[in-house]
């Protein structure tokens, strides 16, 4: 009766409380029933806080109801719950599900499936038994499912690389699901999990203890995972302690089910026990109840905002179960997505939290639960060590199966990386390791560590040893030094960790030596090493003279100074004296019989053959010269092919590597003797430094200032040129050289090793692990496992021999020398250009006037003709068209020499060079002497009568600049001039005198000539148009022809380029214009012709002194011919040197005017005063009326388009034209000075 009285009183109190509520107030309030699983002090304290006033911060009014379930009888529990649901309008239930209330949770799940009332468990004790829940149940749990706990437990195993483990379960409900979950996770993972043993024991009261002991003693796994209840866990750990499975050498992991309450762990639980709980494991019962009530209130508030009213209360247990109403289903959906105080309470359809935050806890040495890890959003964050393996004095606990291993980061043996930022764990093929920080927690109990991931050659050796020898390990990085050195009597580094028993083992690039072997034990060496030297390849800098390095300097000198010059001179000499080629004879002035092949052309020919240049060249004609050129061409092929074949080897970047023979090399022993001093160093506190310090004192003293903090710093110093050589362990250096980017680092002698030794595993003195580890290492060497690991970790791409010679593109550094050569050539050209202008504009004016200049002129002309030759002209039968662009410089020189020969013979020099020089000097003095003025009459050879013209003659082409303007002269008496008179183009008189001398064919349109006769007309008109005065002032004598016989061509910019067709067309037009009538008027003439020959004043009166003399009453020395005007005066060579005016160029003569005269050389020109009658040596032009022309001489004419002048024409004219005893002195002087002006 007493058992039924309690629930009855409880229901009576609940009904009274519900009846006391106002109607209106109850409709706006959410009723929540809180069911406690026990009636302890915590539950009593929580009940006192369950008042509406404690939930005022929630959006809705809360009416809490409490109920305690002290009896585990299912019938009594159902009576209480159903009575509560029938008496009160309850919206939801909050249930305290401890681990000992699994039956209550199952009953509540059944009630929820029948009444559709939301039930929220807040402690997580029912998470295991309610997998899965009843269909249609609205049971929600703040705890985590068994599957989620297994996920975190396996993450802890993965974190420490505990791949081998055993599973022990009891017959507690859910153990089959647990085993199934373990196998599913192990099979789905990419890690090679090894499930060593699976035991299912009867751990309840009265179970077979002997069988349990026997099975537990068969377990040989260092890691064990157990599944049982709290009471069964106490029995299991007690039996495991007797079987030797409890202690520092074994790790136990259990789910939340085995813990129960975390307030007071049982005494049988071992230190270091690991479990997984929710983040609310430290919250009080009152806080958990408040979270449950808030979730129901927030869900109801969300429902009211959508539908405008609160959800309907739950139904009665006595009513017939039916389908879930839409309102209850909608309210349940609103409960699945709730956020409270910044925490996400989203539930899955199975009733568990979607993203729960779990905590990994471990039982420390003080018998308290301590958080060592946190699982948040799929990432595990662990704090090291997982279990307290150290005492308060940091001394490790004696463990026969678990080892603490110290290591040191050094590639490739130990490579340290950060964890994966996405998962927070280590990627496959890596092992979790820790690095101790320099500070501690505020409590001072646990030293914090930084989680890292380690991999490498030594890590793979360690993992293989752990599997073969069967031990677990805790890996950490040393922070108080390097490998190990004794400093002031204290060992540091890995040696110190092992020596002072802070670590059971040390593995890494630890060299075995005698000093270390005295205090610790080493295993057999697993890697052969020693001391090696690493250097850096120098940056490939190509010398600017790299393109010249295929041949030695002696070969280049022999090629271009000796061979090219000698062969060029030889070819030239053979060609010079060849009977079929050019014979350069300057003294006789012979015309060339063939092409001109000079020494310059010979050098150009040989140079073009050497480099296969497609340039215009002139080939020799002699057989001997051709043979020499063929031999040179064969030589050039061999020379160029050899140069090209060896050029690529010198144009690539030259890399220099320091070579040393060993530690006793003079570069190490006497580094100061090198320039600059040799710089080398190592990493201190290692076996390399100890070896050098013990054997080479002076070497160690020098290298101390160049020591590096780490291998990476040393490699950087080598590449930057701060270090010349780095001395270190051969195994490390070979790896660094093989993995170096760009293969800039190399070890001397292809990895030559000095003081050969090996790497070993350090263990404590007289350790019982030494024999087992030595046998395992020897087994790895015999099976080839070590060689496989060396291939994976210790080899690099730079060790491949095919990469020793690497091809690369030639950049600007490779071709710098060629560009430098071009820049130097441009600079020299600029200097020569500046010097040329300086000499031309400044220095040449300061040259004193001396008669030696004429000799220098002849000498320079000879040298010029030697190197440039004389142009060979075609047959004179057909004069070529003028080359307006080239100027025919070579032809002019030859003509000048021929004319000089005739003039010298006329001046009676008799071939003597000295007499010729004196004659030229006398002529110059006579020209500079003052001339007396004469007022007497001048005699003039009669010529054809002229007709006055109103204006002066202008150049052809329509130009407005006069051809010549008369200089104003004082009036003088008429003079008599003997010579050719100036013609009058507008008047045709005295034609009978011309027709008698020259036959004329007359047609219906006038007089016509044959083509050959017309070609002879221009030269005749010029050669006979000469005149000398018997008496005229010497000051007016220019000493040179009035118009240049061989004028220099104008500038290309001002000169229109005319071809043969244009020139022939102009000649035809002029001939047609003059042939239209017997007496053309000035107005009827073409503008180009009329302007060229108009004159401003009438022709003078009669000239006397000839048979056909005509009076010249108005004749004056300065008014009748163009040549005597000062504007057309051409300076001599001497005057050009003194005054800076080029010889043979008029000071005021314009380029286009000069072109006109040069182009129309067949037109009549004024050479003296105009006479009315033609001289006996002249004749009328058959096609140009009013002009006269000289007779032809052996077919030589000065026609259109040619600059040739026969040497015998002037001589014949001097005898036949005027009928005098040779030329007067003035005329001869004028001819010689003409040669000088041409030069």
Swiss-Prot record:
- MF terms per GO, please? monoatomic cation channel activity; NMDA glutamate receptor activity; transmitter-gated monoatomic ion channel activity involved in regulation of postsynaptic membrane potential
The way this protein sits in the membrane is described as: Multi-pass membrane protein
Where does the signal peptide begin and end? 1-19
List all topological domains (Extracellular): 20-554, 645-813
Cytoplasmic topological intervals: 576-598, 612-626, 837-1239
Q: Where in the cell is it found?
A: Cell membrane; Postsynaptic cell membrane
Q: In which tissues is it expressed?
A: Detected in cerebellum (at protein level). Detected in the granule cell layer of the cerebellum.
Q: Membrane spanning segments where?
A: 555-575, 627-644, 814-836
Give the sites modified to Phosphoserine: 875, 881, 912
Name the GO terms of the biological process aspect.
calcium ion transmembrane import into cytosol; directional locomotion; excitatory postsynaptic potential; ionotropic glutamate receptor signaling pathway; monoatomic cation transmembrane transport; negative regulation of protein catabolic process; neuromuscular process controlling balance; positive regulation of excitatory postsynaptic potential
Q: Which Pfam families match?
A: ANF_receptor (PF01094), Lig_chan (PF00060), Lig_chan-Glu_bd (PF10613), NMDAR2_C (PF10565)
* Location of region: Disordered: 918-988
Enumerate the catalysed reactions: Ca(2+)(in) = Ca(2+)(out); Na(+)(in) = Na(+)(out); K(+)(in) = K(+)(out)
Residue numbers marked as site, Functional determinant of NMDA receptors:
612
Q: Name one GO cellular component term.
A: NMDA selective glutamate receptor complex
UniProt keywords (A-Z) are:
Calcium, Cell membrane, Disulfide bond, Glycoprotein, Ion channel, Ion transport, Ligand-gated ion channel, Magnesium, Membrane, Phosphoprotein, Postsynaptic cell membrane, Receptor, Signal, Synapse, Transmembrane, Transmembrane helix, Transport
Q: What does this protein do?
A: Component of N-methyl-D-aspartate (NMDA) receptors (NMDARs) that function as heterotetrameric, ligand-gated cation channels with high calcium permeability and voltage-dependent block by Mg(2+). Participates in synaptic plasticity for learning and memory formation by contributing to the slow phase of excitatory postsynaptic current and long-term synaptic potentiation. Channel activation requires binding of the neurotransmitter L-glutamate to the GluN2 subunit, glycine or D-serine binding to the GluN1 subunit, plus membrane depolarization to eliminate channel inhibition by Mg(2+).
Quaternary structure? Heterotetramer. Forms heterotetrameric channels composed of two GluN1/zeta subunits (GRIN1), and two identical GluN2/epsilon subunits (GRIN2A, GRIN2B, GRIN2C or GRIN2D) or GluN3 subunits (GRIN3A or GRIN3B) (in vitro). Can also form heterotetrameric channels that contain at least one zeta subunit (GRIN1), at least one epsilon subunit, plus GRIN3A or GRIN3B. In vivo, the subunit composition may depend on the expression levels of the different subunits. Interacts with PDZ domains of PATJ and DLG4.
Instruction: Fill in the domain comment.
Output: A hydrophobic region that gives rise to the prediction of a transmembrane span does not cross the membrane, but is part of a discontinuously helical region that dips into the membrane and is probably part of the pore and of the selectivity filter.
By what name is this protein known?
Answer: Glutamate receptor ionotropic, NMDA 2C
Organism of origin is: Mus musculus (Mouse)
